[in-house]
Amino acid sequence: MKYAKIDASTVGSNTIVAAVAGKRILVLVYSFMGSGNQNAYFCSDATAITGTLYLNNHIRSTAAYGATTPAGAVGLFRTEIGEALNLVLSTTANVGGHLTYLVTD
């Protein structure tokens, strides 16, 4: 298993895990919080691999502006071969957290 911090604040794509040649990035669990109302989703390079996560105070989450998942051995989502794992943000606001992942074939 490998671990990555989520430290993003730019509108658009923010690289969380760099691409690994010939490999996929399989996300097992994640947790993050934002400093304001915004939307976020994970991408394999530029292709969305999750639905939109609405980081606002109208959803039930670990914090008023956060998203989290339970740990699982089968994985939640993965990138395409040789592509980076990115987090896309809809507004400029600080987002921080962490994720656990595997590098697979």
Task: Report the location of each language-model feature.
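Beta-strand-centric surfaces of beta-sandwich/beta-rich domains
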Residues: 1-105
